[in-house]
């Protein structure tokens, strides 16, 4: 189930949903799984992907394969879902792999790293490159098999009590930043904080942190960050295209019939596309509403971007010298990134640059 099977299974989703294989489905046993999400139920975008996944599995199996979806904190804490899958507390988790870089930095390569791939490039690396193969080899060490479970697209750069005008403003900044990016923020003089999405607002409101990032306008507006920190930065250089994953225990997955395995993969493919579409469709209006309500947008200064890039590349070299898992996967990732960046510089960036300079 590598590369092009994602596309094949996405097509299978339509075939099975249309009832083209009732005999195959009806012959299957009843299955009940539990899914633990790392996200709050209030976010119909990022949490919603798990609902889409579970719904499609149910539909394509004729109701014989049911997955109950549980938000962060219901069954497991947001950052405890991988352990939950490993020990069999739940069969599947929906999460951002980079949350677990403390287990091994290589987890971040399955999600997002600073100045990494954008969402289209990430999906391309997974399906047509070596991404899915390499990450599955790595995740097997943790008794997990992964299926792509959505992408937010390029993110914003977070909410700040005071705008960042230069590198000097990064010094001592208590910043809630997701996953692996905290390592770079720390090298830049900041103080990274790893806080689940549902707890960020309270931390900002109480002044426990100076700044926080989550995803983008739609989610951030729902979480109310604009009420406690008026300055909104861009771009989110640490998350050009963060991929979410469905992590399934290898024993649970191996116990499924071939037909159920195909349904799981097809349902994940639908959820993957659905999440990106939701973000792309909902962020524009949310951004307009935020600005109309007093949010102040600012671009990260050049010295901040250049320092972040320099420190990121140095960090990757340091990790490659110490972690053979990272070295193997990152070497392939970096080559793919270089090739993609060269191509996107012409057709994609050329078109986007012109379009964004026009008035519609």
Which residue ranges define each predicted feature?
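Core domains of carbohydrate- and sulfate-ester-processing enzymes
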Residues: 127-131
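N-terminal secretory/targeting leader peptides
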Residues: 2-19, 24-122, 132-360
């Amino acid at each position: 189930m590598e590369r092009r099977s994602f596309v094949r299974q996405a097509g299978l989703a339509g075939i099975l949903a249309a009832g083209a294989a009732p005999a195959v489905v009806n012959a299957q046993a009843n299955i009940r799984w539990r899914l633990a999400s790392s996200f709050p139920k209030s976010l119909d975008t990022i949490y919603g992907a798990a609902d889409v996944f579970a719904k499609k599995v149910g539909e394509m199996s004729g109701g014989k394969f049911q997955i109950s979806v549980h938000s962060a904190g219901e069954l497991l804490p947001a950052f405890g879902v991988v352990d939950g899958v490993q020990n069999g507390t739940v069969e599947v988790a929906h999460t951002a792999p980079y949350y677990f870089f403390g287990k091994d930095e290589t987890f971040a390569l399955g999600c997002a790293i600073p100045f990494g791939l954008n969402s289209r490039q990430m999906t391309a690396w997974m399906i047509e490159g070596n991404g899915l193969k390499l990450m599955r080899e790595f995740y097997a060490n943790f008794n997990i098999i992964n299926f792509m479970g959505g992408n937010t697209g390029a993110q914003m750069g977070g909410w700040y009590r005071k705008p960042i005008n230069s590198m000097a403003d990064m010094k001592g900044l208590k910043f809630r930043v997701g996953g692996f990016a905290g390592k770079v923020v720390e090298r830049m003089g900041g103080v990274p904080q790893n806080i689940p999405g549902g707890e960020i607002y309270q931390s900002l409101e109480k002044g426990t942190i100076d700044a926080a990032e989550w995803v983008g306008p739609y989610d951030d507006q729902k979480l109310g960050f604009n009420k406690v920190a008026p300055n909104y930065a861009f771009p989110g250089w640490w998350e050009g295209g963060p991929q979410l994953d469905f992590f399934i225990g290898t024993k649970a997955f191996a116990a499924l019939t071939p037909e159920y395995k195909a349904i799981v993969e097809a349902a994940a493919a639908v959820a993957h596309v659905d999440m990106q579409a939701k973000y792309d469709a909902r962020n524009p209006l949310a951004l307009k509403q935020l600005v109309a309500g007093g949010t102040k947008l600012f671009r990260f200064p050049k010295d901040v971007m250049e320092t972040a890039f320099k420190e990121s590349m140095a960090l990757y070299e340091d990790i490659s010298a110490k972690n053979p898992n990272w070295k193997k996967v990152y070497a392939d990732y970096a080559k793919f990134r270089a090739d993609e960046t060269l191509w996107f510089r012409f057709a994609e960036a050329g078109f986007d640059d012109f379009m964004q300079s026009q008035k519609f």
